[in-house]
Structure formats: C-alpha cells, structure tokens
Amino acid sequence: MSDFVESEAEESEEEYNDEGEVVPRVTKKFVEEEDDDEEEEEENLDDQDEQGNLKGFINDDDDEDEGEEDEGSDSGDSEDDVGHKKRKRTSFDDRLEDDDFDLIEENLGVKVKRGQKYRRVKKMSDDEDDDEEEYGKEEHEKEAIAEEIFQDGEGEEGQEAMEAPMAPPEEEEEDDEESDIDDFIVDDDGQPLKKPKWRKKLPGYTDAALQEAQEIFGVDFDYDEFEKYNEYDEELEEEYEYEDDEAEGEIRVRPKKTTKKRVSRRSIFEMYEPSELESSHLTDQDNEIRATDLPERFQLRSIPVKGAEDDELEEEADWIYRNAFATPTISLQESCDYLDRGQPASSFSRKGPSTIQKIKEALGFMRNQHFEVPFIAFYRKEYVEPELHINDLWRVWQWDEKWTQLRIRKENLTRLFEKMQAYQYEQISADPDKPLADGIRALDTTDMERLKDVQSMDELKDVYNHFLLYYGRDIPKMQNAAKASRKKLKRVREEGDEEGEGDEAEDEEQRGPELKQASRRDMYTICQSAGLDGLAKKFGLTPEQFGENLRDSYQRHETEQFPAEPLELAKDYVCSQFPTPEAVLEGARYMVALQIAREPLVRQVLRQTFQERAKLNITPTKKGRKDVDEAHYAYSFKYLKNKPVKELRDDQFLKICLAEDEGLLTTDISIDLKGVEGYGNDQTYFEEIKQFYYRDEFSHQVQEWNRQRTMAIERALQQFLYVQMAKELKNKLLAEAKEYVIKACSRKLYNWLRVAPYRPDQQVEEDDDFMDENQGKGIRVLGIAFSSARDHPVFCALVNGEGEVTDFLRLPHFTKRRTAWREEEREKKAQDIETLKKFLLNKKPHVVTVAGENRDAQMLIEDVKRIVHELDQGQQLSSIGVELVDNELAILYMNSKKSEAEFRDYPPVLRQAVSLARRIQDPLIEFAQVCSSDEDILCLKFHPLQEHVVKEELLNALYCEFINRVNEVGVDVNRAIAHPYSQALIQYVCGLGPRKGTHLLKILKQNNTRLESRTQLVTMCHMGPKVFMNCAGFLKIDTASLGDSTDSYIEVLDGSRVHPETYEWARKMAVDALEYDESAEDANPAGALEEILENPERLKDLDLDAFAEELERQGYGDKHITLYDIRAELSCRYKDLRTAYRSPNTEEIFNMLTKETPETFYIGKLIICNVTGIAHRRPQGESYDQAIRNDETGLWQCPFCQQDNFPELSEVWNHFDSGSCPGQAIGVKTRLDNGVTGFIPTKFLSDKVVKRPEERVKVGMTVHCRIMKIDIEKFSADLTCRTSDLMDRNNEWKLPKDTYYDFDAEAADHKQEEDMKRKQQRTTYIKRVIAHPSFHNINFKQAEKMMETMDQGDVIIRPSSKGENHLTVTWKVSDGIYQHVDVREEGKENAFSLGATLWINSEEFEDLDEIVARYVQPMASFARDLLNHKYYQDCSGGDRKKLEELLIKTKKEKPTFIPYFICACKELPGKFLLGYQPRGKPRIEYVTVTPEGFRYRGQIFPTVNGLFRWFKDHYQDPVPGITPSSSSRTRTPASINATPANINLADLTRAVNALPQNMTSQMFSAIAAVTGQGQNPNATPAQWASSQYGYGGSGGGSSAYHVFPTPAQQPVATPLMTPSYSYTTPSQPITTPQYHQLQASTTPQSAQAQPQPSSSSRQRQQQPKSNSHAAIDWGKMAEQWLQEKEAERRKQKQRLTPRPSPSPMIESTPMSIAGDATPLLDEMDR
C-alpha cells in the first residue's frame, strides 16, 4: 500500500509528443530553504509521517498518474529532507544537447561527463528550447512564490540574511507581476543559482582530459600560452544576454558570441583572491559604500533602511513597543538591559505606553533623517529620554529591520492574494451559472483582512501555508493564464490587433500543444482529486468556525449534523484510490485534520496555549547516563519531569539543546502532564477542545459523526499541530537562551571598556619634569610579562604617553626566588633586581603593570613593590603605582597578526608586555586592536557558551559596545594619523565604518595635512551632509596642539562634544554668561568662548530653561537637555565619562591568577590534587611531661609524633630538645592544578580514624578530594577525601538539582545499571590450570568470538559455568553455529586441575585429546559431509521460514518432484534440519550428528548416502517417539461402528510395537480381527480437519492424517502412534483399519538392538485365505495378551475413550505424491 502512496505522490516523469511517443525529461533537483526559513507546514512531511496511517486504505490498483515521480516533502519541517528515489528510466536517446547538460550541471552542482557530440541542423527558432524548459518550471511554482514572499532570505525572525547578490541587468523590461517567481531555482545548498557558469572552450588544448582538468582547477599555468594570447587576451569574455524565457518570468542566460578585447594590464581583481579583496574592503561594492552619502552601517544592513510616512511610523512604533518592550520572554530572563541589571524578569514591561511616541521619534530619525543610534542618543536626547537609552535605541534599530522584512513579505503575499483573486474571478466569470465545486474555496475579503492583520512572522507563515493548502495547485494555472494574457497584450501593443493575432496563432503552431502541468501529488491532493472535499465539508464546522469556537472557549458556532451515517455517506465516494468506506472516511478525516491544522486562527490560539502550558521532559540516553556526572553542565537537569518551560532560566535551554546535540539527553515538549499519578482528573488539552467540535445529542448517527470528528481533531493535534508547535517553541526558547548569552558577552565587554585610563596621583603628575617630546604628554607605563614555562626570561616594555614603545628590558632570572636554595640563583635574582631598579630610576614610569599569568605574579609584584619602596625611601623616585593586570587580552594580542606586523622583531612575551602597558594606559584602544577582519576578539572568553551562538550576532553585539563607548569618548583624528596604533577606533565613529573610516584617514594622509577644523571634513574630505551630521560631533580636534602652527581660524568648539549644528547656541551662552553686548561692533563671540573655557563657573548663572523656551518658540524644537549638555561641555571639554581605574579586589585577583570563576571552582566540587607533604603542629613546652609508656613492651611513646621506640623517658625529652620531633600530624598538604594550595585535615582523610597520615598518603601521590572551604585571600582550600564525602549519597556537597528533577526515574535507571553490573561482575567460571593447546580460560561469548576466525570442526576447551568439576568443549559446526558439549570431571586433585576421568553423558574418556579425537572429530567430519552435500542450503542459520520458502519455491518450479534440502540448525547446534515437500505443505525433521554417525528417526546411519537412501524409502512412514497424553485435546469421533469401550488403541499401539520383529502379516490380521471391527474395504478413511499445531514446526494447517480419496483402497498396517492433535468429528462412519501384510517390518528396532537401516517394499500382496491358519494361533496369543493388559488397565483410573484412527500409512503407488501423508513430528532428542 505504501508503494501506491509513493506512486501517487509522484510527479510525471515522462511526457508525450504529438505522436504519443514518450519524451524523456531531465529531472531537476531542487533543495528547499532550511526548515528554520519557513515552516511550510509539511504538506508532504505530513504525508510521510502520516502516510503510515493511510497505508491501509488506498488501493494499489489506481489507474491514474502511475508514472509519477516521488516529489518528497514540500515542507521545511522535515529535519532530514526526503531524498528522491532512484527510478529506472528508459532513455530513447542518450545524446543530450549541451544546453541540457548545462541545465543538469546547474541543478545538480556537479560536472556531468558528456558523450560524443553530434552535429545537428541549426534550428530556426529557440522557442522549442523554451518549451523544454517549461517542464521543470511549472513544477516548482509554489516554491517560486515562497521565494518571492520571503525574498529577503531571512530565516527565523531574528536571523540575519545573506546579502542578496546583484541581479543581472535585463534586456527586456519585465512586468511587475512577473516578480512572483523570479530567481527561484536553487542548488543543493539552497542558494539561488543566479549566475550560470557556461562552459568556455579554453585555448591551447584538444585533449578532453586536459581540458576537464583545466576546467576543474581553473588555471593551467602555461605561461607561453599567456604570452601567445596576451595581445588579444587569452580569454574571450562572453557577453550574456538576459532574455525573458516566457516561462513564469524566469530569466534565462544565453551567451552571445561577441567578444571584447580586455586590457592586457592585470587588474587587482586578477592578482588577489576575492576573499582577500573582500576582507581588505577593495571590491566594487566597498567603493560604492564609501562614495554613498549614508552611514556605512545603514548600507550594510541586510534589509535596507527605507523612508516611511508618519502613519507607518506610528504603526511600526506600536509594533516594536509590543514585541520588543512589552511582551515578556517565554523563559525567565534577566532584565534585557544590563545598564538596568538587577531588575527581576517581571519588570520586563517597565516602559510605559509613553515609550511608543519616543520609539516613533527614534524611527523617524533613523529612517527619514538617517541618523545613527549614537547621534540620536547624544544629540536628540529630548526626543528619546528618559524612556529610551542607547541600548534601547539599538533594539529599536534591530526591530526596525524585522518590521521592514515583515512588511515586505506581507506586501508580496498581498500581491499574490490579489492575483489569485483576479484569476478566480476570471474563472467564475467564464461560466457564472456553474456552481462552485466542493474543492474550490473562494478567496474573499476576509482572507485579505486576515493577511493585513498579521503581526508576526509566525502568523505570516500560517497565512501563507493556509493559502498553499487551498490554492497551491492553482498557482501554475494562474501563472500560465497571466503569461498568456501578457503575451497577447504585448503583441497587440506592438503590432496592432490583426497582426498580433496572426503572429500569436503562428507562434502557437510552432510551440505545439499546451504543456501538461507537472502535478505535485501529496496526500491532501490525492484526497482532493478523489472528491473527498464534499465529505470533509459534512463534518459540521468549517475550520474558521472551529477556530472561533476555540478562541472564544465556547461553542459559538453549533456543529451542523448531516442526516446520514458516516459509513453510508462514505459509500458514495468509494473509488479506485479509496476502495472501502473506511478508507474514504480515513481520507476525509485526514483532509479535515489538515484543514484545521492549517487554519491560522486555530494555530494562533494553540500557539499561545502551548507556550503557556508547555512542559519539558528530559531523559538521558545510554551515553548520557554514563557521561553526565556531577562535573558536567547537564548534571542538574539530567532527568526532568513536567518542568514548565516558563521556569527555564537564562541560558539553561541552550545547555539542554547542546546536551541533546551531543547525544546525551532526549527532550520532549508536550502540552499535557506526563506520567503523573493521582492527576487522572486533569483533562488533556485534546479533551478540552474536542467539545467545541461536538454535537450534544445521543442518537447513534450523531455519536458516529462525533467519533469521526474526535478522530479528526486528535489527528490534527497529534500529527500536525503539537509537533510543529513544539518545534516553534523550541526555536524560540533557544533564541532567548542565545540572546541571554550574547547579552552576557556584551555586559562583560562593557565592563572592560568602561574603565578609564590609569591616572597617577596628582602630586606625581605635577612634579613630573620628564615630559619631553619623546615621552609624549600621557602617562608612561612599564609592562612586565613572563611565561608560565620554567627558566623563561621576564620582559619589560616601556610605553610613552602616545602608546609607542620607547624602551624594553630583558630579565632572564627575575622569576627565581630571592630565598632560593642555590646561592647561584639568589645572586642572579639580585642582579636582575638591581637592573630593574636602575631602569626605573632612569625611565621614571608612572605605573608598572605585571601580567596576571599565575601565582608567580604575586611574587613578582612583591619584588617590584619592594624595589619601588626602596627607591621612594631613598628619595630617588616618587612613589609609583604597581598594578596586577589580567593578561588574557595581552596574550591574544601577542598571538595576533597585527602584533607580528607591528613588532616583527620582538619575542612574543615582549609583545605581551607592550599590550599590558597599553591596556592600563587606555583599555578602549587596546581592545580595539583585536577587532580586525580576522575576528580575533572572539578569542576572548566572554561566556562559556559563546561559541554556540551565531557568530555574526555576537560580533554585532560586541561592536555595538565599541560604538557606544568610542562615541562617548570621542576620537582624535590627528592622533590617529600620527600614531597608527590608535587608528582602530575610527571605524566605530557614528556614521563611519571600516571603509569610510580608512578612506577618511587615507585622504588626510594623501594631503599630508592635519584636520584643523570639522568644516574640513566637508571641504577637504568631501564628506556628504548625512555622514557629516552623524560623525562631526564625535571627531575631536586638539585645538591647543594646533597652536601657532596654522594660520586658519581655530574653532575651540571643535575640541568639544558640542555638535556643529549648535555652535551658535554655545557662543550665545558664552556671550550671555559674560554679559557682552552682542550689538557692539567689536563683539567677538569666539573670544567670549575662550574666556568662558578659562572661567566655566560663569556659566552657572545662565537661565538655560528660558533659553530653551525661546529656541522652541523660534521653531528649533525642545532643546533643554542639549543646552545643559553644552554647558557641561564648556565646563570641561570632552571630559572622560568612563569609570576611574581601580586596582583589582581580592576576588578578581584570585580569579585572574587561578583562571577560575565561581562556576568552575566552588564548594563541593570534586577535584584531583597532588600531595606535597604532611602538616604538623609543633609541640608546646608544657606538654613535654605527657609521654606514654607501653606496659607490654616497656617502651616510651612520644605524645606528638606517636614514635614509640624510646627505651627511656629521657630519650623522649632529648627527642623534643633536639628538634627532631616534627610534632602532631594535623593533616595533608596538597597542590591543585590551578595553583591553589589544598589542606586535608586528618579527620577528613578517611571515614576510619587515622593517626598517621603518612601511612595513608605519600608525597607525589594523586588523590581525589572535594572542596569544603575556599580562602581566596590565601589562595587555599580545605578539602576532604573521605569516601562518604566523595560518594555524597545525601547530596550534602553536590550542586543542587533542578526543582523538577525526576529522582524516581534516576533511581530506576541506577537500579537497572547496578543489576547489570552485578550480573557482569559475577564470574561465570573458575579459571583453570590445564596444559592443552585447545584450552583457554575464556567464557561463552569470548569462545564464540574466537571461533569466528577458526575453521569448521576446530575445538576450544574452556571452564564451565556449571562449576569447578565441569568443562565445556565448544566446536565449530558451521559459520556462526557452535556446539557446546558438557564434560564432567571425576577424580580431581584440586579445584584447578583436570579430573582423572572425563565423562560426556555416560561415556568415559581418559583425557582431553581422547575427547577431541574420539568424540568431536568424528562429529565434525559427519557435519562436514552434510555441509558439502549438493542439497545443503544455509537458510540464514537454519531459519525454518527460509527453508519452507525455499521448498515451496522449488516445488512450484518442479511440481512432479519432491524437493528436499538440509541445513544446519543454529537454535540446536549439532542438529540439521531436513526439509521436504511431498505435497502442498513443507515438512521439517531433525538429523542429529553423533560420533557414530547421523541419527534420524531413532536410527544411526554411518554415511550420508545411507541416510538419504533410507529417507527416500521411508519418508512416508510415521515419526516414532510421540505418545499421546491424557491431556490431549481430542474428541471421540462420532461413528456408526463405535469403538468398543474396552479397547485402548494407544495401549494397542504400544503392544504392537512390543511384539517380536518377525511377525507376519497374518499375525497382524489376527490381532486386527480381535478388535471386533469388520473389514469394510469400501469405507473411505476419515479425512481429518487441519491440525492447529501442524508438523515439526512447519506451521499450522497440515492435516493430521491425509489419505487417498480412492474408495477401494486397503489400509496398510504400521505401528500406530496416535497424535494428540485436535480435530473435528468426521461425518462418515469410521471403521478400525485392518493391518495387512508387509514384506518386511518398518517398525524401528528396539533400543537394545544394533540399529540396521532396512528398506521395505510397498508391493501390494493379496494373501489367499488358505494361509490364515498360522495367523490364528498367533491371534489367540495376542488376544490373551491383550486381555491381561486390559485387566490391568481397568484397575487404573478411568480414562477418556480414545478415538479410532485409520492407519497413517496407506498403501499406494511408489512415490505417489497424492498418497504421501506421513505425519512428520519434530525429533525432540536434544
């Protein structure tokens, strides 16, 4: 059935030409956008996931669309996109055109080997080509629409899209409507194939292989060829025409055979890799960005910034407020802005509705005036504060991008809706009287309104998927109709009506018949084409009505009841695809379920409910149970049960997803509680909502319809909605967790950048007479860096005020200790100290920084402080600061390409010293050094999970921090030119970027001039007004340094934060403050400004509020905050607003030197440490007299060190006095890997009492401990290594687990693992000491593994799990089949030795060699004979079913033969299955290999030939060995000639078997006669019903007895074994069969006799009556014997009357298939 579903969900692979011949098609492979990009709701995922439910009700014998190719899923929801199945294709012509090959290569993305090229007649028209193309296009028009609607390439709402490549120029103008399906062909990676690569014949090669290599590698490096072709250019540059292919508006590229000469000079684009050009910003696009008068970041945004009308701004502001500021996150997140951190999550919507107006103002500035965020934050404060600060403005900027994207997509979808509406109107107008078909749903204004009201990307996808469900298959028809009308209009317009019509007719004639629409066959379409829409509409509610019921939570719309039973109604819809009413109902339910699942209102309600109620359940995988220990990040949520997703915190869900990706956990998000006992009354969500689809009546008809509705609702939820909602919710939670991580990274960078440069004491600065030109005007810093490797030198770098390195110093022995043991080391250390002292004295730095590499930094900083103190005491040098600085940034800089380029000859540690000095000098500039195109900044450790967030998003967030801080501090352009070290800041200036910033510096360098005023940005640097407005206020000019070096007018305000637009107000304030007369001729506002700058306190008297009111009255707007800012700026120009530097506190020093954080080093953590010694408490004088004497030995014991071998008390005192007593041992000293010292008190060494720790641990030993206490000041930790603490069964030390932790599930898993461990640890055998080449001390599994590579018949002898007096001999019967033989030992000396005698069953052996030679090897030889037999079959290790299938198959092929096969049995090693099929049913028996030969039916055969010869003669004989039990399920058959009650046929059978072997047939006749049954030769033997057990495992259904239908036959006597099969009472009279003569008995001989295979003759011999006298005597004997047996039987408990049984062996013609009815029972002698 699934085959049919697949064939139904296919697309037609072949098309037919005019003559009806099949024209093979080139199948294009399309890969859709990723599932995040759009959840097209799994139209076909549904079909795949849900098809399993539909497999049973669609008939295979469908007559339409049989050759259609499986289209896979058109949804993005399937994680593993369904691959296209390979199908056999019949190709009538393999010689494809080059264009076809090109098309294949474009779509597959691989080169296709092309066959020999055949020259063809050139076609007059390209239209035929166009037509061929149309096949592949129509098929994917729905994808085209999706591409158009979501054309900006954005995935989930927050994801940034790749920049769309520039579209090629079109030669022909396209109609606007054509845009719906532009550029929708995608390659295997989902990228649009915008630029087809045409094969170009490269010159110089005729060899195909060489040319192919050249094409692959692109370059041939034959310089002679370059020379040869240089004049005319070695490559022909093809111009491409872009023509309208007239197939859904797709642009088709055709090479034009025109060539251009290229300039022979190589351009930059030929010399460098494109990636290098891109990273260096040298592409054409970069040049365009530089030239355009728009802020660089505006141009780089993936969604362009567009101007907006006031109405749209209002609408957008409201939307951004609701989504970004008023809607709380689903999970619990810290306040989104760390500037206001500490706010609880509930305060998310702290911004009131007044924010909306502020957002609108900000959007107006951004979209219409093109102001960047920092400009708005600094110069338009009145319009955004206090509601919005700078980070809120960035959020508005980001959400504006989302809004623009949503708006574009809505507009695209609206256009599509309008087109479909117009198309529907045309269709209906063509025949207005025709009623609408069931499958047609009119697209009305309600749908348009719903689209207009869409407020999120999720809702838009809902509307789009809803549209696809109802109108998806009409899209190609709509496009065709639109295309046809456009063509007609075009021709009419160009050539007039008459000519146009003629041409059109001619064109149609050339094109041939209309192409068949490529059909997408998904499950819904199949149901629709079968006309099930009508039945689906009779369920009583439309999806829209159900959605409204669901939204209002009451039955607003009553369910309409159709007046017929569902099954009765379904009969009208039965067809070839849905052959039964049940299948029809299943299909209708599928349609209803999918319609409900696609209804936007239903999805909106369910989405909201799902997010509120969703519960998270987590269980670990097998790997997770093993790997997630208490040190693992997933430990606290290893098991979770019903945790509401609303209670997830911060980045917790990201950790959960990571653990799931690593295969440690499985997560499940559901709307209902899972597995909670005692909550049975809680309704599931399904039970809550199904009532909205019910009709509350009790008639059978209504109940039946209610049942159908319930099943449809359940399917909609379980199969569609829950899965999709869980996925949506998971993506949202993951996005929130990632956003938290990005915010945490931003916060850390914010804290690093907010630190102001180091400032020495004011006195030091004033006394500094060393400020010459070389040193610069800033502070001088000496950076000291060292390596953690031993014996590496220490490097010092001196940096002047401008960040330039002026000197450096190498101290090779500075890391050695002053108190080192070796005198040589102490002397070298002293020399280095002296060298550093002189260096400090000469260079006089303001501060010394020491790298916080490890604990050694503490020693170095003490040494430096001591040197500084000595110099200060000697009044040789003012006191200078010594600071410890984190060297993480310095190490990153040390390894960067930038530092290598800047200090190529410096060793790495010296480069680190330079970075340390610069960092304390100005952290902002130093951090900017690692913001290169290599993205080095991401190597800094901001957050443990930073590598799991989207790199671009993290970079953008970090760059925002730089932009904020750089614009607050300002950038001195002239300093950046003079000192390239500070150039990195220019890219973050508002309005600029990496391209515009470097371009600005480049212009200034080319002009070899300094920037003397901000006006020059326009006049000299040609900056546009928009960029100038943005950046002018943040570029500062040091007007004081210009001094007399220039003749131009110096504007003092250029050195301040005052924006040029407000210079006049600043001057006015200065004039007013000084009370100058502005009307005077000699009034000089500039002079007033300079005076105010010297006496800023005069500004305090100004009434700025009145000034602001005056400005507002004059139309300048509200400027009161700006005026206060101007006053502050005039008081102190470009005052540094950063937090003053402070030395690191104790905790920061601890984290810096140990490289730990509170998350990685905490109380309760399990750690490993090395023992460094034993700690003792020195003895106190007053305790000397407490020595203890041992009365038994007479020796004295020291009360402290417990030494107990002192013969005299005086020796104990001497022991004290000499200082040789170490004192009382109080604990163990250890060292951790992070440099922290650990201490284990004696009582925490073990759960037992420990008096001497040195007996428990040794120095250098590694011990596992748990942290009890951390002392960050002393860098020490108290530890415990007691087993009870390490195990911590009571969870006193371990990290706390989640509130919803599932302890029960963990306990159950733990118990299961413990049981398994116990089972594995239990030794199944005792290791033995036995010298034999075949003996191995291994277990059962290891033996079988060893056997895999051994030969058939090889032996392994091993210990037995039965005990020490048993061995097991394992020998290889066949591949994968091994027999294990138990050997009993007797006469053992000990448990490990070999027994004197060995027994297998009742057979004795002297030693192992005898067992191998006399027992195993013969069996292996016999087995080999069977394995090599011509009728041997493997049958998957003796699989009965496989053997039966083989027999049935062979029997069908040769019905006149009786097939038989033998195969080794894996279930019973040592036995072989003998299968044969005389008639309709296969029969299977066992052949057992023994040392004597083959045992079959109780007889031993020494050869294979003898075995099969006997089998062929006796296969019809009954199988001996089964006696019926009294519990047999048998019934006494009804018979006219009833069986006498006093005869027990079972006993009779045993009696006959016990008779002498040489009894003649007359004797049997006499025995038969005494039963009182007359012979009735005409009676047909009973035909018993089929047995429910069957024979020998051959399956039920075999007849217990099968006899000939011939009425005149005579039964032949054989020993009777009554099988215990149940059967029905026969309808015919039954007579007891008589035993007739046999030439030789077929009764197997008794067990005591030597078995001799014998053959019997089946000749019918009619004995004359005259020979019966001998039989009478025997008859009397038999009768007497039977009477005795009967008497014994009567004494026993009365039994059921046994049934009479005809003889199983019926006399027949030899090898008659019809007469074979031997009941072959399994031989159970195992």
Curated annotation (Swiss-Prot):
Residues 1-199, 484-520, 1636-1726 are annotated as: Disordered. The keyword Cytoplasm does not apply. It comes from Homo sapiens (Human). Residues 2-485 are annotated as: Interaction with IWS1. This is Transcription elongation factor SPT6. InterPro entries: HHH_9, NA-bd_OB-fold, RNaseH-like_sf, RuvA_2-like, S1_domain, SH2, SH2_dom_sf, Spt6_acidic_N_dom. GO terms for cellular component: nucleoplasm; transcription elongation factor complex. The modification N-acetylserine is found at residue 2. Ubiquitously expressed. Residues 1633-1726 are annotated as: Interaction with histone H2B and H3. Interacts with RNA polymerase II and the DRB sensitivity-inducing factor complex (DSIF complex), which is composed of SUPT5H and SUPT4H1. Interacts with KDM6A. Interacts (via SH2 domain) with SETD1A. Interacts (via SH2 domain) with POLR2A phosphorylated at 'Ser-2'. Interacts with IWS1, AICDA and PAAF1. Interacts with histone H2B and H3. Interacts with WDR43. Residues 111-122 have a biased composition (Basic residues). Belongs to the SPT6 family. Residues 1213-1282 form the S1 motif domain. The gene is SUPT6H. Residues 1325-1431 form the SH2 domain. Gene3D superfamilies: Nucleic acid-binding proteins, RuvA domain 2-like, SH2 domain, Spt6, Death-like domain, Spt6, helix-hairpin-helix domain, Tex N-terminal region-like, YqgF/RNase H-like domain. Histone H3-H4 chaperone that plays a key role in the regulation of transcription elongation and mRNA processing. Enhances the transcription elongation by RNA polymerase II (RNAPII) and is also required for the efficient activation of transcriptional elongation by the HIV-1 nuclear transcriptional activator, Tat. Besides chaperoning histones in transcription, acts to transport and splice mRNA by forming a complex with IWS1 and the C-terminal domain (CTD) of the RNAPII subunit RPB1 (POLR2A).
